[in-house]
């Protein structure tokens, strides 16, 4: 939820964003039902919620973004959270097209990288990953 000093503006903007990002909100609610007992962190500046998911659900430092909700493992570092925040900004921009324009290319790149044993450097040079780093103000040297 994005917050403004004016409460009415906050409500109006968030209703519009809720409708615009419905294709991310619905899967986020399903994930919220699955990943219970999470530690919740709210970044009011970025208007996002970060949920630290129990380690048993993922291997390594897996993270993903569904609109204004970011799911991370406990050992996920701050730069990865910033990267996922960049994807949240992409969600605001692309709205209902987010999964076609961002999620699908991102997942395909991730799977290809794993299958072909490509480096993180290789992965982060492609759009939408490069764009997410830019929007999230990621120090890429700390991620690689």
Predicted regions and their residues:
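Metalloprotease/metallohydrolase-associated module, dominated by Zn2+-dependent proteases
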Residues: 2-41, 50-53, 58-59, 98-144
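Active-site scaffold of zinc-dependent metalloenzymes
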Residues: 49-76
């Amino acid at each position: 939820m994005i917050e403004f000093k004016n409460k009415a503006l906050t409500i109006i903007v968030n209703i519009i964003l809720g409708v615009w990002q419905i294709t991310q909100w619905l899967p986020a609610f399903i994930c919220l039902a699955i990943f219970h007992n999470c530690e919740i962190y709210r970044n009011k500046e970025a208007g996002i919620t970060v949920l630290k998911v129990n380690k048993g659900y993922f291997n390594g430092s897996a993270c993903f973004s569904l609109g204004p909700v970011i799911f991370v493992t406990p050992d996920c570092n701050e730069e990865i959270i910033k990267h996922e925040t960049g994807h949240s900004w992409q969600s605001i921009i692309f709205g209902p097209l987010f999964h076609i324009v961002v999620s699908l290319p991102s997942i395909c790149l991730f799977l290809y990288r794993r299958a072909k044993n490509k480096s993180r450097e290789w992965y982060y040079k492609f759009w939408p990953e490069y764009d997410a780093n830019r929007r999230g103000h990621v120090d890429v040297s700390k991620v690689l």
